């Protein structure tokens, strides 16, 4: 639409960033008061890593949008039991999956589980439409699975990291999360055990001190 240029490359990431900030505000407003919602949106929008992801057009921008939007809609569904919120939750979760595999959906599912646990809303699982989330989710990610299939499964001759015979389906459904979590692709890096702690200092700057104080 906009041609091949920097604006066309970064504009979608700006839209995803706006979705993230708006979803954070709406979710916080649903769970708390207006002041808290404004502060939550402000902290996300001005954090160092979030701004960097937009300017560099990184995959973390649509990942964040999918997670936050999907979580917001899932919480709304649990509280209001409206089918439209369930569908939008599946859409957000599918967007998150499309970026980095199961990482996004796992974050959403774990958060929702503890929300249900703390609020004792187990009755949501007795509704038939709740379970419709599963087929809708897989329907929405089917284009992504197909894209990985035609790029890799149909071309086993492709050499990646010195190896051929890669399966795109296996990568997005398994390797993207589980192999990375197990460190199978970073065995030689010997990362510090405190990596996430000191990385959070700059990534959530200037709010990292407040976050650590809250912990």
Region spans (language model):
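Transmembrane-helix motifs of polytopic, lipid-linked glycan transferases
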Residues: 11-31, 69
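Membrane-interface transmembrane helices that cradle and orient dolichyl/undecaprenyl
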Residues: 30-31, 35, 70-88
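Juxtamembrane segments of multi-pass membrane glycosylation machinery
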Residues: 1-15
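Short acidic/glycine- and proline-prone juxtamembrane loop motifs at membrane-interface regions
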Residues: 13, 49-62
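Membrane-interface alpha helices of multi-pass inner-membrane proteins
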Residues: 52, 85-100
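Alpha-helical transmembrane segments of multi-pass membrane proteins
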Residues: 15-18, 45, 61-72, 86-89, ...
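Transmembrane-helix signature of polytopic, membrane-embedded enzymes
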Residues: 24-46
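Transmembrane-lumen/periplasm boundary regions of multi-pass, lipid-linked membrane glycan transferases
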Residues: 104-215
């Amino acid at each position: 639409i906009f041609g091949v240029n920097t604006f066309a490359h970064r504009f979608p990431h700006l839209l995803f960033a706006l979705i993230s900030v708006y979803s954070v505000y709406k979710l916080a407003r649903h769970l708390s008061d207006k002041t808290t919602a404004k502060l939550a949106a402000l902290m996300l929008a001005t954090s160092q890593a979030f701004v960097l992801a937009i300017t560099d057009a990184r995959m973390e921008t649509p990942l964040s949008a999918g997670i936050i939007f999907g979580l917001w809609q899932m919480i709304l569904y649990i509280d209001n039991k409206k089918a439209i919120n369930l569908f939008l939750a599946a859409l957000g979760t599918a967007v998150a999956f499309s970026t980095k595999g199961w990482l996004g959906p796992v974050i959403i599912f774990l958060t929702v589980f503890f929300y249900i646990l703390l609020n004792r809303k187990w009755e949501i699982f007795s509704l038939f439409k709740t379970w419709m989330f599963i087929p809708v989710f897989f329907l929405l990610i089917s284009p992504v699975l197909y894209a990985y299939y035609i790029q890799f499964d149909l071309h086993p001759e492709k050499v990646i990291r010195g190896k051929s015979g890669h399966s795109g389906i296996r990568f997005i459904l398994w390797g993207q999360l589980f192999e990375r979590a197990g460190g199978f692709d970073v065995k030689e890096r010997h990362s510090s055990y405190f990596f996430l702690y000191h990385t959070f200092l700059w990534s959530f700057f200037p709010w990292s001190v407040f976050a650590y104080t809250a912990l």
